[in-house]
Amino acid sequence: MNHAQLRRVTAESFAHYRHGLAQLLFETVHGGASVGFMADLDMQQAYAWCDGLKADIAAGSLLLWVVAEDDNVLASAQLSLCQKPNGLNRAEVQKLMVLPSARGRGLGRQLMDEVEQVAVKHKRGLLHLDTEAGSVAEAFYSALAYTRVGELPGYCATPDGRLHPTAIYFKTLGQPT
């Protein structure tokens, strides 16, 4: 068995990780995580979501990483680089997902460390994200020194259909040069 390796997914390597990303989304949603999909998510929908990422990756507006072990995707994270002329200093952290069976191994922290380092290289000194209020993810982001701004009530539905608030976080990495 190989050790888990962090890899950047490019337009060229996308096909190699497509199935693993779809499986990760499927298992994450069916594990109860609120990442934009409902409990009736099937693999066809998961593949469609994956396929929608490729154009943004090719355009350079979305950066995507996976942690893979023996070519199995265990975790992933995305960084959406704001393309607005007045927002070139910021980016949104999206879809940090870790397989339920791979949690507790530090993969989320490994991904977030990489996301932050690359954000600085892209001169994105302000990162923001949202996560389900009251979820275990809140403690995770707080431990990484993200600042909680507040909540939006009834912002999204959990996979089982209940409306739930989302918590908004940010982190300042430094001033772009």
Swiss-Prot record:
The keyword Transferase is assigned to this record: yes
Domain of life: Bacteria
UniProt-annotated binding residues for acetyl-CoA: E27, L96, M97, V98, G104, R105, G106, L107, G108, R109, D130, T131, Y141
Short name of any one Pfam family annotated for the protein: Acetyltransf_1
Keywords, sorted A to Z: Acyltransferase, Transferase
GO molecular function: acyltransferase activity, transferring groups other than amino-acyl groups
Domain N-acetyltransferase intervals: 4-174
EC number: 2.3.1.-
Record's function text: Renders tabtoxin-producing pathogens tolerant to their own phytotoxins.
Extra remark: Tabtoxin causes wildfire disease of tobacco.
Protein name as catalogued: Acetyltransferase
Species of the source: Pseudomonas amygdali pv. tabaci
